Amino acid sequence: MIKTDILIIGAGPTGLFAVFEAGLLKLKCHLIDALPQPGGQCSEIYPKKPIYDIPGFPEVLAGDLVDNLMEQIKPFEPGFTLGERAETIDKQEDGSFIVTTSQGAKHHAPVVVIAGGLGSFEPRKPPIPSIKEYENKGVAYIIRDPEVYRDKKVVIAGGGDSALDWSIFLADVASEVSLVHRRKDFRGALDSVEKVEELSKIGKINLITDAEVVDLKGENELDSVLIRHRDQARGEELKDTDHFIPLFGLSPKLGPIANWGLEIEKNAIKVDNAYDYQTNIPGIYAIGDVNTYKGKLKLILCGFHEAAIMCQSAYQRINPDKKYVMKYTTVSGVSGFDGSKKEAKKEVVKSIN
């Protein structure tokens, strides 16, 4: 049995930052995540993708953000149960909880925090009959390492931010990038759409609209895709490629958490945002993209804010007879459970007679 003060389900950026905020309050954390490494989608789906709206970072790669968070929480020695999914939760007589994972590991804590981002998720796959046989043989639904595509021919399908952004990024990596979208209009950010149009005009992206990839070809691995144009006069064309990457977004699922008796709204967990991001079950909180409330913004920076507020409430729940006096880290420094301490240099005061 793993015992901790706060059990966090989800080791994405929000869950990781919650470890830091809890550590400042001398609360120990343990994290459960179905993925084999911390970082959530930032590590699993877009580690090389730049993020522009993290305060203090004009630009930071998603993977680097995770690395920085891991370094930041290191003094607080969090525990991790990775590659296992939280399956069941049982409330104890004293109000604490036991959470059991898919591998049977039991975790006991007075506070449970669900920070699972979109929960469990899987990529939306296009209805191409032959697509399964080419998975990992030229077909991928997630770009983990852009270097795989260096000097290769790549066909990307999709009309959202991921398809646009990766087409732009790979234009400087791959030997040829083709972006196929079934409509003329894209659903992504305006500047990304304009950038794709600009790169298309100078021949760095082959933009194919009003068309779909309908079949895949190749002996032992992918070597071409069949593109069907909406304009019947253009018919179909067979395009040589080394890689086909359909980026149609993720299909989010809460998984077993949906059966825990929590109040769910549109595949998200309802919380009391006016106070502490607690759910309808006292002692269970939800922070980050997995929660919903009036005015909710699904941004990493908002998840950080929610983590800080949640930890204050968790402290009071765990220590009902204590009153925590908030101190700024610029004054108190950061004292880790490993004996380390970070603090500002003391000012030298000299009296003048």
Curated annotation (Swiss-Prot):
InterPro entries: FAD/NAD-bd_sf, FAD/NAD-binding_dom, Fd--NADP_Rdtase_type_2, Ferredoxin-NADP_redctase_2. Keywords: FAD, Flavoprotein, NADP, Oxidoreductase. It is an enzyme of class 1 (oxidoreductase). Belongs to the ferredoxin--NADP reductase type 2 family. One of its GO terms (molecular function) is ferredoxin-NADP+ reductase activity. Homodimer. The keyword Acetylation does not apply. Its cofactor is FAD. Binds 1 FAD per subunit. It catalyses: 2 reduced [2Fe-2S]-[ferredoxin] + NADP(+) + H(+) = 2 oxidized [2Fe-2S]-[ferredoxin] + NADPH. Its EC number is 1.18.1.2. Gene3D superfamilies: FAD/NAD(P)-binding domain. FAD binds at T14, D33, Q41, Y46, A86, F121, D289, T330. Pfam families: Pyr_redox_2. This is Ferredoxin--NADP reductase 1.
